[in-house]
């Protein structure tokens, strides 16, 4: 119990330390004690912290929370811990929707990028559901989604071959996910999408709790399973598409954050896991952005490379531990000995001795 209580405290400490590092470290360096006075000042340090580092910090938290919540919605709706946006064609479709106009030299305003990402993500997700029979089998949806994601990534490779050198560098950097050079305009561009997604998440939580019981039990309780899965996919698309439009596909946050949330409180339920998954996703992206910004300074590395580098092995370890714990709980306590066998015997029938076992004392006296 103490260990479970210490984990949220540790996450809070890590988040605060990462936030201080995000605002202090870099060029110019700002000591943590001077951060309150530096925010909003007219000097060089104040402009860098207020206009560059602080919006990047807020964007990392918002993007991570959206990806973590979307990952949990997909995993709960499909009842599969491997259901992630990268495996269902959602992230690849959103990236394709943003990259295609750039390569085709279409002059479109920047405000349309979230809508292009939304259209691409919806196309990839709906293509997965249509090919899998509208979610009749969670395993078939996952396998079909992997095939659709591979096809969309092949389309991205074709676009990269068609692009010139400058566009190729932009697309390559975009596909790895980056928070570099993001401003307050990028942060405010996510707010309308959050205003749509948050009420939908609140309405979706009870349905996710029912879907955990299985398709037959959910139908018996009045839930239309296929429509519920389509709605869950739509909510995940609304959460993922604007993040991909602004930051690119930040990989495997939707895989790691739900497993961390379940690890923190295994019996939390869909509502508790959703909040914890969003918080864990925000902390993961914020922590991953620090080595992305500072490891090879002054050159920045994509944050998506660090989330994939850390998220995949940690998520696999958490997944294995969760399965082991589930197996132990399913086995239950072992029988206490001959007394438990006697309690299971049917009255009126003689109990035959088990072969290879030592006879009980009453049988020994009868043999004498």
How should each PLM-predicted stretch be described?
Residues 1-348, 354-368:
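Alpha-helical transmembrane segments in inner-membrane proteins
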């Amino acid at each position: 119990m103490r260990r479970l209580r210490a984990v949220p405290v540790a996450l809070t400490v890590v988040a605060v330390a990462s936030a201080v590092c995000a605002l202090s470290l870099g060029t110019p360096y700002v000591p943590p004690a001077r951060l309150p006075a530096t925010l909003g000042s007219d000097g060089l340090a104040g402009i860098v912290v207020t206009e560059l580092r602080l919006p990047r910090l807020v964007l990392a938290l918002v993007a991570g929370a959206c990806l973590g919540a979307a990952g949990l919605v997909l995993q709960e709706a499909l009842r599969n811990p491997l259901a992630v946006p990268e495996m269902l064609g959602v992230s690849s479709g959103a990236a394709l929707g943003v990259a295609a106009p750039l390569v085709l030299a279409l002059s479109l305003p920047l405000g349309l990028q979230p809508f292009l990402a939304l259209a691409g993500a919806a196309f990839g997700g709906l293509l997965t559901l249509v090919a899998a029979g509208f979610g009749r089998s969670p395993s078939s949806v996952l396998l079909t989604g992997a095939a659709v994601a591979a096809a969309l990534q092949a389309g991205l490779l074709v676009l990269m071959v068609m692009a010139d050198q400058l566009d190729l560098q932009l697309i390559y950097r975009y596909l790895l996910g980056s928070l570099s050079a993001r401003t307050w305009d990028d942060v405010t561009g996510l707010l309308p999408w959050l205003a749509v997604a948050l009420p939908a998440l609140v309405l979706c939580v009870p349905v996710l709790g029912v879907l955990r019981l299985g398709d037959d039990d959910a139908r018996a309780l009045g839930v239309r399973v296929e429509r519920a899965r389509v709605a869950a996919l739509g909510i995940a698309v609304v959460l993922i598409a604007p993040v991909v439009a602004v930051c690119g596909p930040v990989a495997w946050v939707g895989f790691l954050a739900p497993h961390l949330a379940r690890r923190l409180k295994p019996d939390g339920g869909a509502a508790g896991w959703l909040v914890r998954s969003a918080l864990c996703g925000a902390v993961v992206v914020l922590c991953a952005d620090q080595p992305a910004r500072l490891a090879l300074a002054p050159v920045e590395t994509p944050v998506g490379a660090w989330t994939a580098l850390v998220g995949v092995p940690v998520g696999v370890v958490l997944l294995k531990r969760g399965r082991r714990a589930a197996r132990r709980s399913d086995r239950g306590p072992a029988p206490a000995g001959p007394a438990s066998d006697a309690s299971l015997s049917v009255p009126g029938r003689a109990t035959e001795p088990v072969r290879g076992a030592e006879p009980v004392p009453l049988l020994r006296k009868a043999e004498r």
